[in-house]
Amino acid sequence: MFGGSKHIADYDYHVQKAGGDSNAFTNNDYTNYYITIPAPNIETALWLESDRMLALDFSQKSLDVQRNVVIEEFKQRYFNNPYGDIWLKLRPLAYKVHPYQWPTIGKNIDHIAGASLEEVEDFFHRFYAPDNAILSISGNITDEKALELVKKWFGDIK
């Protein structure tokens, strides 16, 4: 999601140029991508997010970079903290048949390392759609202006 789109090669460049920053986090029920940006540059954020939803660029290079990032996050969370791996052991005991039994970040390093580009694309196209998305805007912008910009940048996404 941070590797660019078919139209925008460097997502972070545009966010930073507009005075903002962006990041994401995931839990068992949702993934939150966010941009914090000065109000006069809200349209930049909406342009970037709509393009990411419409034209995400799937490449092996991007997958390899993000896979390494996730593996390092996995190590940090579970192996570089005292008793960090206890959650890997408790989840399957607490949730025998529920998807919560699996850590959001991946079951283990081999599981993460084995993710294929095809699996990532399939997941994206199945779950990253308007029916599964919530767009939230806050700040110094009127409701009318926010709605106008959302229609402009997201209105054609199906």
Predicted feature residues:
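M16/insulysin-pitrilysin zinc metalloprotease superfamily fold
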Residues: 3-5, 36-67, 147
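Histidine-acidic residue clusters that define the catalytic metal-binding segment
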Residues: 33, 92-133
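Acidic/histidine-enriched alpha-helical segments
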Residues: 16, 57-75, 142
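Buried hydrophobic packing residues in well-ordered domains
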Residues: 15, 33, 49, 70, ...
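Short acidic/His-enriched helical or mixed secondary-structure segments at domain edges of catalytic enzymes
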Residues: 71-89, 93
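M16/MPP (pitrilysin/insulinase) zinc-metallopeptidase core fold and M16-derived inactive scaffolds
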Residues: 1-35, 102-105
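Extracytoplasmic
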Residues: 10, 17, 28-32, 65, ...
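An aromatic/glycine/proline-enriched structural segment found at the starts
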Residues: 101, 134-158
